[in-house]
C-alpha cells in the first residue's frame, strides 16, 4: 500500500506557516505532509478548491490522502470532490461547518467584504456545501477569549451568553452529521492547531481512524 500524504489546509486570511508546527510534529511521527499558502481572501471557495485539487493531484498522484484542516480549510476540503483525489481520513479543527454566525452578522459590512473577500462572505451560508469526501472527525475549541485571537475580543461578544465558542466559531457550528468522532478542547480559534491535546487527537485519528481514549 502506498504511503499516505497528509494535506494541511490553513484557514481564511492565514498562510501555510500557521500549520507549520503541527506539520513538523506529524513529520516527526513518520508522516509526509504537504501544505501551501492559497489566496483565501481573493476567490470563492469553489475556485480555491478547484485550484488546490489540481495542485494536490500533481503532487500526490494516486496516493491515499489524509487532511488536517483549520477553520475555512475544513470547508475547502468539503469541496475537494475531484474523483482523482483519494481521500481516506480528514480531521477538521474549528471548522464553521454550519456556517459562521459572525460572518452572517457582518456579511453586508463593506470592510468585512473587502478584507475577507468572496470566501469570507460565503461562510455566512452553509446550505449548498457538499458533505466531506471521506470519514472525518471534528475538534472544537472552547476558549472564548485569548490575547492571541483578535476576533475574540473585537467580535466575540456577538455570541449570546452561554454559547460555547473559541472566540470565532461556536462549538455547535463545528458539528456536522456523519462525523465519526467529535472532541472539545480548551483552545482558542487562532492557534488551536498548536494545542498538545489537539496534536494527540489528530495523531490518533490519522493512525487508527479514531481518537485515543
For each of these PLM feature ranges, what is it?
Residues 3, 82-213:
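Helical cap/lid subdomain of alpha/beta-hydrolase-fold lipid enzymes
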Residues 6-17, 21, 25-135, 156-158:
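Serine-dependent carboxylesterase/thioesterase catalytic core
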